[in-house]
C-alpha cells in the first residue's frame, strides 16, 4: 500500500508532465489575449460554501464531496469545483469595487468521490474562467469564444457547441409548476433519484442518466420553451453574437448542468472523438450566486470549467501528439580524473549562460557516456580528456551530423552560444 497511490489518484510522471505544461501554458496564453487574470484559491473551503452554491440536492454535495472536521471542529471540504471558491474570493477581497467586469481564470486540483474511470479521477484538475460584473449576452459569447479558440489552438477543431437557456427565477416559477405537475403524473415510473429530485429540484430530472427513466419522460416540458421575455431576448442575442463570430452551435434543450446556481445561458462543448463523443467543457451563467454567498446585489457572473485529464485523453484519441520541448543542449563526456574535476566549472559556466548542460554522475565508461548523451537527445557532446586539458582544448561533436571539431575551452561557451 505504501508504494501505491490512493484509488482515484494518478502520478504525473516526467513522460506526461510536459503535456500538462503545454496545455496549461496555452490556456494562460489564450486567457491573456482576452484580458483574464489568474485567481488562486485554497484547495479547501468551508463546507457550507458548497452547500449554498452547488446545491444541497446535487450529487456533488450529497455523494461526492470530501468533507471532514478539522482540529478546530470546523466543517471543511476539499473543493469539488472551482467557481464557488473564486466567487467567495471575489467577495472577500472586494474585487467588485474595481472597474467591472472582473475577468478571472484558474488552474486547480479538485476532488470528488466518484467511481474512477478514463478521464475521471477522484483528484482531477481543472482550467476555469469566471467573468463577474456583466449580465450581457456578449459576455456569454466571449466566454464561449475563448473556450473554442483554446480548443482549436491545441488541435481540437471538430467541436460541437451546445447551448441552452435554463431561465431565471421569473420564468422558472411558472415552468416549475408545469414541470412538477408533469413529473407527479409520472411518479410511478420514475427512478428513485428522479423521484427525490421531483420534490426538491424538479428541473434536475432532465439530467437523469437512467436510460429507462429517460425514455419514460421523453415528452418532458423544457424550460427553453417557457422563457420570459428577458431570458428569450438574452438567448436570441447570444445566438446572434455566436453567428457573427462563425462559431457553429446547436440548441440542446436537455442541458441543465449539474449545479444549482445556473441561470439563463448553459452550454457544453463536445469533441467528436474517434468513434465517440466527449464533453470537454461545460459552463453557464450564475447571476444570483454573488448575492447568495453574501456579496453585493446585482453582480452577475458566467464561467466554465474543463478537465485537464479529459482534455489530454481527447487529444490522444484524436491522434494529436504534443512534442516534448525539453532537451539537453550539451552533454559533457570526461576521460580521466582531472578532466572530470575540471568539467564542473565548464558545467557551471554553461548553465549560467542559460545553456542546458549535464554530465555523468554515476561513473559510466566513456562508451556508456556517449550512449547516454544520445539517449537524452543532447544537441552537442563535449569530450574532455586529461591530455586535451594540457592544450586547453576539447572535442565538440554535433550529435545530429556527427561532425567533430577541436575547440578552445576558453572560448567554448561563446562558440556554443552562436551555434545553439
From Swiss-Prot:
Its main location: cytoplasm. GO terms for molecular function: ATP binding; catalytic activity, acting on a protein; histidine-tRNA ligase activity; transferase activity. The lineage of its organism: Bacteria, Bacillati, Bacillota, Clostridia, Peptostreptococcales. One of its GO terms (biological process) is histidyl-tRNA aminoacylation. NCBIfam families: hisS (TIGR00442). PANTHER family: HISTIDINE--TRNA LIGASE, MITOCHONDRIAL-RELATED, HISTIDYL-TRNA SYNTHETASE. InterPro entries: aa-tRNA-synth_II, aa-tRNA-synth_II/BPL/LPL, Anticodon-bd, Anticodon-bd_dom_sf, His-tRNA-ligase, HisRS-like_core, HisRS/HisZ, HisRS_anticodon. GO terms for cellular component: cytoplasm. Belongs to the class-II aminoacyl-tRNA synthetase family. It is found in: Cytoplasm. Homodimer. It comes from Clostridioides difficile (strain 630) (Peptoclostridium difficile). This is Histidine--tRNA ligase. It is an enzyme of class 6 (ligase). Keywords: Aminoacyl-tRNA synthetase, ATP-binding, Cytoplasm, Ligase, Nucleotide-binding, Protein biosynthesis.
Amino acid at each position: 500500500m505504501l508504494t501505491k497511490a490512493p484509488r482515484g489518484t494518478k502520478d504525473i510522471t516526467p513522460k506526461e508532465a510536459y503535456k500538462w505544461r503545454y496545455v496549461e501554458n496555452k490556456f494562460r496564453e489564450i486567457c491573456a489575449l482576452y484580458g483574464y487574470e489568474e485567481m488562486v484559491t485554497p484547495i479547501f473551503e468551508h463546507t457550507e460554501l458548497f452547500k449554498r452554491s452547488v446545491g444541497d440536492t446535487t450529487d456533488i454535495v450529497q455523494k461526492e464531496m470530501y468533507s471532514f472536521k478539522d482540529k478546530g471542529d470546523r466543517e471543511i471540504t476539499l473543493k469539488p469545483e472551482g467557481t464557488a471558491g473564486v466567487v467567495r474570493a471575489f467577495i472577500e477581497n472586494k474585487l467588485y469595487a474595481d472597474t467591472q467586469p472582473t475577468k478571472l481564470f484558474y488552474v486547480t486540483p479538485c476532488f470528488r468521490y466518484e467511481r474512477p474511470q478514463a478521464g475521471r479521477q477522484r483528484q482531477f484538475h481543472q482550467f476555469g474562467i469566471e467573468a463577474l460584473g456583466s449580465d450581457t449576452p456578449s459576455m456569454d459569447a466571449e466566454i464561449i469564444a475563448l473556450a473554442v479558440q483554446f480548443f482549436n489552438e491545441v488541435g481540437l477543431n471538430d467541436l460541437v457547441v451546445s447551448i441552452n437557456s435554463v431561465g431565471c427565477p421569473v420564468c422558472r416559477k411558472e415552468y416549475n409548476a408545469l414541470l412538477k405537475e408533469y413529473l407527479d403524473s409520472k411518479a410511478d415510473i420514475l427512478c428513485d433519484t428522479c423521484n427525490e429530485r421531483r420534490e426538491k429540484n424538479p428541473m434536475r430530472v432532465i439530467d437523469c442518466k437512467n436510460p429507462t427513466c429517460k425514455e419514460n419522460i421523453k415528452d418532458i416540458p423544457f424550460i427553453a420553451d417557457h422563457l420570459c421575455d428577458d431570458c428569450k431576448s438574452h438567448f436570441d442575442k447570444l445566438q446572434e453574437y455566436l453567428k457573427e463570430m462563425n462559431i457553429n452551435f446547436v440548441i440542446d434543450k436537455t442541458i441543465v448542468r449539474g449545479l444549482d446556481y445556473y441561470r439563463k445561458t448553459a452550454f457544453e462543448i463536445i469533441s467528436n472523438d474517434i468513434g465517440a463523443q466527449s464533453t470537454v467543457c461545460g459552463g453557464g451563467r450564475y447571476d444570483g450566486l454573488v448575492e447568495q454567498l453574501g456579496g453585493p446585489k446585482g453582480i452577475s457572473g458566467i464561467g466554465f470549467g474543463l478537465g485537464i485529464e479529459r482534455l489530454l485523453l481527447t487529444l490522444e484519441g484524436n491522434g494529436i501528439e504534443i512534442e516534448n520541448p525539453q532537451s539537453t543542449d550539451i552533454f559533457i563526456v570526461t576521460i580521466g580524473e582531472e578532466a572530470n574535476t575540471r568539467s564542473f566549472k565548464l558545467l557551471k559556466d554553461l548553465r549560467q549562460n542559460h545553456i542546458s548542460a549535464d554530465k555523468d554522475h554515476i561513473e559510466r565508461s566513456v562508451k556508456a557516456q556517449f550512449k547516454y548523451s544520445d539517449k537524452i537527445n543532447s544537441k552537442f557532446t563535449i569530450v574532455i580528456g586529461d591530455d586535451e586539458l594540457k592544450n586547453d582544448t576539447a572535442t565538440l561533436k554535433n550529435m545530429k551530423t556527427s561532425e567533430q571539431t577541436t575547440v578552445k575551452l576558453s572560448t567554448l561557451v561563446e562558440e556554443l552560444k552562436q551555434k545553439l
